[in-house]
Amino acid sequence: MIRTFIARQSFALWGLGLILGSIPCFSQSVEVESGTLDGGAGIQNCESCSGQQMVGNLGTGSVIVPVQVTNAGTYRMTLSYATGDQRTINVTPNQQAFVPITCPASGGWSTVATIDLRVTLQAGNNLISFDNPYGYGPNVDKFELSPLPTPLVQIIPFGINSRIEYDLANGTYDVYFTNTKVVAEASARAHSNAVYRSNAGYTSRTYTSAPVTDRFGTGTRHVITLSGGSQLEMQQVFYTYPSRDEFYTEVLLNGPGSNCYQMSPLTSNAVDIQSNADHRALFVPFDNDKWVRYEAKEHRYANFTSSEVGTLYDNTSRKGLIVGSVEHEVWKTGINLAGEGRTQTSYVSVLAGWTNENVTRDKRGHGWVSVGQQSCRSPRILVNYANDWRQGLEVYGQANAIAEPRYVFNWTQATPMGWNSWGAIQSDLNLTKAKQVVDFFANEVPVFRNADQTLYVDLDSYWDNLTPGGMTGDFSQLTEFANYCKSKGLKPGIYWAPFVDWGKFNRTMEGSSYNYQDCWTKVNGQPLDLDGAYALDPTHPGTKARIAYLINKFKASGFEMIKIDFLAHASLEADSFYEPGVYTGMQAYKVGMEYLIDQLDGSMLVYAAISPNIATGRYVHMRRIACDAYKGISETAYTLNSTTYGWWQNQMYSFIDADHVVFANESEGENRARLASALVTGTLITGDDYASDGVWKTRSQELLQNSDLLQIINDGKAFRPVEGNTGWDPNALFVKSMGNSHYVAVFNYGAEAKSFTIDLARVGLNAQQANQMKDLFSGSNLPSNTTAGSITLNVPAADVRLIQLRESALPVTLVNVEAKKVNRTTRLNWKTTAEVNNREFIIERSLDAKAFKPIGTVAGAGSSTKSIAYQFTDTTPTLNQTNYYRLKQVDLDQTFAYSKTLAVRFADQDSLTLFPNPTHGPLTVKVPRTLVGELRLEITKNDGTPVLVKKYTSVADRSIQINVAPLNVGVYTLSLEDTEGNRRQARLIRN
């Protein structure tokens, strides 16, 4: 009761000696150069150091410093050091266990900084050594020792048997997950005009708590308020929720002048994940630009800052700690991870207010936050220790979606699939080629459709080849393209980079009276050039007017999807921003992206290319996990590096995408691997030049019409990596479950064939469960040996195996199911290699691949172990359309299963095409090649009443143009008949 009472009151560190125990009020300062040097360590001059000297070369060398204290106990050591880059020093008192201390860069080799640690000393003489036999150490100036005040611990429970132990006497905290200490001696700090640290300078620390209900649920908000010592008030805040195993923390600085450029709610030199068989630290990039890669570094070599989230894990046990920001509207956040020079513990420091030109692309430091306000708050940080680091990262992804809900409208339609012109056509794009691509998808690959029975056909950069006069020119060709897509049942897409200026010269900005130079983002007064383009200030009214102008053009043209690119340009730190109150790149990003989404007004699927990995989750439906990959196995490996370590982003985005899937002239194996990389990531955007002939067309007709493969992405979710110890290379093995089916993808990125033995338990499957196995590329069933606990797959060089495992074997093993057009009939052939209680096959047909109806039955063989061939002929397929077929296999007990869906098109020469359709004016009628001679065109109402009749003795280019504006709004039938009585019909919608 006494401790609880004290913990909830404001107490003065030096005024509670009777309650807290005796606290000697003294400290001593010791110059390190007074010690004994060894192994090449040497004294160096340093004007900013005390005594103008320091000790260097402490990687290969060491220094031993004698210290005398009156009482045995734990002491706070404040170490003064200088280093140009982050380095670790080992502090060893009296040849005991060394204390590794990672020292962040101090600002240069002659600039001194300080860091605190704890050492245990004996009464009387002590010898403290400083060295780093595992790497390079910082230069050391001096250290100060003061007895550590008696701890006063406030316990903050969370999760199951987890707690934070906050030491009110010393301003640090330990974190226990399921009664295991993982984080020790963590502190908070804030960088304003001075540096404020939770563990130094404050004389009073108070604990309070109150219920809280926010987006994460109902829980408790725990607040440690630090004051005194002539410092600005600091508050350390912890959020806990009964239903969550993680906790969240933030730090605030309060009072006049509390604005900050960097804040850290958690910095610890003593993180121990308690599992070290294959200890890894994960680097997560800020964006997907410049072919950046994720990297799972070995812990002993880790010394880097990861973007927004940092993960320390053991790949063998899979236990791991995840620390990351879940708020991105104000701060860029880095998670500094260091294991270099350590054997077990790690250094972890959250850095809200972090920039790095090679990672965040910034060319200046982070902007100040809360300028002119009375309080400055860091982002909220998730801290989670998971039994499986992969699950922990998925929880982190979900937490981001909770903390910052989508600004873009929720996507309820099917997983997007389609084509993008940048894959192969690129700068050669024109209207003719764009239409030829549409025709290829409409006529040659009718099964390649998403669950909504459509595809997106997206014009990328160089769409302005179709707008003579540029952005202010003639958009009629784009409108024609969009209408042509829709006439074929497809959806048109467009591309734009809204926050860049490729011209880089001053001129009037489209849609406004501003000049481009007024809108350029500037650093040190100069335009900021990234990726060959000047960044535009996303808060400037000229940038906004340009966005509104062009988005309205796209909407008027009829586009239903937009791919937006080079978004990281909008997040760059700048000298200043146009909009008042905006001081950081992420604040500017929020302004620009919200304005862009407002202009789109729910009219399009929004798809991001180069963009911030995590902060973009609010604004788009779909995002590329990597960028600018095309066809070969090396590019498949590059995209799958991002999927291996970034798959969890599908918790924030409706879909993540593996970039262009281009088959080109690569080997069949590389084509399969490229396609599989998209399926593993969760969507499929192709990119070949389907306006010209080549082997890629044949490959596409085969690979893109394999319904077993296409069904994998129905849920739009990525596969999980099995291992996380591949450095900056991709994993070879991925797994995903859908219902009672499990999919295993095994990639061979090498130049030689390779055999893979897959431990089913390691993959996450029931090793004792009998499974039916099917190779989805070949369609063949494989011998099942899964009850042995593993399967072995041989994968050719630069290839992939994609296997489906079903938890219960099907009673009938189907192979070689095919359907082909024979004159004006459809012939279906299939075989079985085994049958158990097979009653019959019901043949079903559909015109939309959704609503199927039975058209015939073939009796089954009951039970058989022999190969049996079956055949059925559909003598009345619907002509001028695509007919879809499937087999419904029915057992004697009435249970059933479906085959894959097959498509047979009867419209190659016979279809009647109308576009645009719907229309309220001009209409083009494409005349089928089977209609000859004089033609009679008739438009009738639904009751058969003619409303328009015309005759044509000849037509140019097999096209007829008419104007349907005089017709009333409604649905009509348009018929075209030749002199021989051949007749074709199509539905016409007048809007």
What positions do the PLM features span?
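Extracytoplasmic
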Residues: 28-152, 792, 805
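Glycan-recognition surfaces
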Residues: 509-541, 545, 587, 591-695
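Carbohydrate-recognition beta-sandwich/jelly-roll modules
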Residues: 155-451, 561
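C-terminal beta-strand-rich structural cap/linker in extracellular carbohydrate-active enzymes
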Residues: 128, 785-809, 970
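C-terminal tail/sorting-segment detector
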Residues: 892-908, 949, 969-991
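Carbohydrate-binding surface patches
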Residues: 67, 75, 80-81, 247, ...
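Short, compositionally biased serine/threonine- and acidic-rich segments at solvent-exposed termini, linkers
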Residues: 807-910, 932
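Short, surface-exposed loop/turn motifs with a glycine/proline- and acidic-biased composition
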Residues: 859-884, 953-980
